[in-house]
Amino acid sequence: ESASSLQTVLEAFQEKFGEFRPKMKWINMGGGHHITRADYDVELLIKIIRRFREKYGVEVYLEPGDAVGWQTGFLISSVLDIVHNEKDIAILDTSAEAHMPDTVLMPYRPAVRGESENGKFTYRFGGNTCLAGDIVGLEAGDAEYKFDSELKIGDRVIFEDQIHYTIVKNTTFNGIKLPDLLLLKENGEVKMIRELDYEEY
């Protein structure tokens, strides 16, 4: 995710796999580099790549990764029901498993518009599949969201920065409808790009 992390990885790579370097013509430094994030050290990344390329005489590749779509889209869902099972769980018309796989497979908890660090009302967000673990942010160990006011059936829940996985890695698990893709223009106009229906399943 960061240039300093890449530097650490490359040092370990050189130490453990240095014997293979003379046979290499190129190296892929992978994806996941958040180069479009405001606090990303782009200058350090450039130095790392130049130094490696010049030292070993190899071509260096970076995969585009989610930086291409960083902060470019959100996932809008609605509360279908609210149940209590030791904790309040808002059941959504979206699914962590089918629409936000990074929130199930990785220690990642997406931000939700309107959440409040000191809010009095705490919820977990459950998906609309039959999967027991279809809970947003469960793998991150922080699956609870706080709000200043109670959620109600029909309320919208907007997950920030979700386009990078919601569009490219979603599934129709359990026959769950894929999210529609809309474009929000700078003037506020909303344009339907693709509406997905049961035929897609």
Description of each model-found segment:
Residues 1-84, 174:
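Active-site loop/helix belt of alpha/beta enzymes
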Residues 48, 59-201:
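Charged (often Lys/Glu-rich) extended helix/loop segments that serve as interaction or gating elements
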